Regions:
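N-terminal beta-loop-helix "entrance" segment that forms/cooperates
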Residues: 29-48
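Short secondary-structure capping micro-motifs at structural edges
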Residues: 14, 48-53
Length: 121
C-alpha cells in the first residue's frame, strides 16, 4: 500500500508517521511529474514513466491518493489521522481502474468538481 502526496505535503511529518506506523509507504510527487499517469507514479506493473516534464502550475490545494490499500487499512489510516489531530485534506482519492490512467492534475480537477458539488457550490 502506498500514499501519493504532493511534494509540499512531504514536510508534514505527522502524515508520514501515521503512514509508517501502518506500513504504508509515502511517495512524494514533485510538480514536474504531474504529466505522468497515476499508475506510473504509484509503480503499478504495466505503467512506465514517460519522458515528459510538467511545466504547468502546481495544484491549488493538497491532494492525497492511496494505491493498493484495502478498506480496512484505509479505515485504520483515517482513524489514526483523525486521532492525531492532523489538519484535514479536502482532496483524497483511492486509485481505481478508471483514474489510474489520469494525471495528478486530471484527478485533482475531478476531485475539486466533486467537492464543489457536495459542498453545494
Amino acid at each position: 500500500a502506498s500514499c501519493l502526496v504532493g511534494s509540499e505535503m512531504c514536510i508534514r511529518d505527522s502524515i508520514k508517521k501515521v503512514c509508517e506506523s501502518l506500513g504504508i509507504s509515502v511517495i512524494c510527487v514533485d510538480r514536474c511529474d504531474y504529466a505522468q499517469k497515476l499508475g506510473a507514479i504509484a509503480g503499478i506493473v504495466g505503467f512506465g514513466m514517460v519522458n515528459i516534464i510538467y511545466l504547468g502550475r502546481g495544484l491549488s490545494d493538497e491532494m492525497m491518493v492511496f494505491s493498493g490499500i484495502d478498506s480496512e487499512l484505509l479505515d485504520k489510516f483515517l482513524s489514526e489521522y483523525k486521532k492525531n489531530g492532523i489538519e484535514p485534506i479536502n482532496y483524497k482519492a483511492v486509485l481505481t481502474v478508471n483514474n489510474i490512467f489520469w494525471t495528478p492534475e486530471e484527478l485533482f480537477a475531478e476531485l475539486k468538481k466533486e467537492h464543489r458539488k457536495f459542498a453545494g457550490r
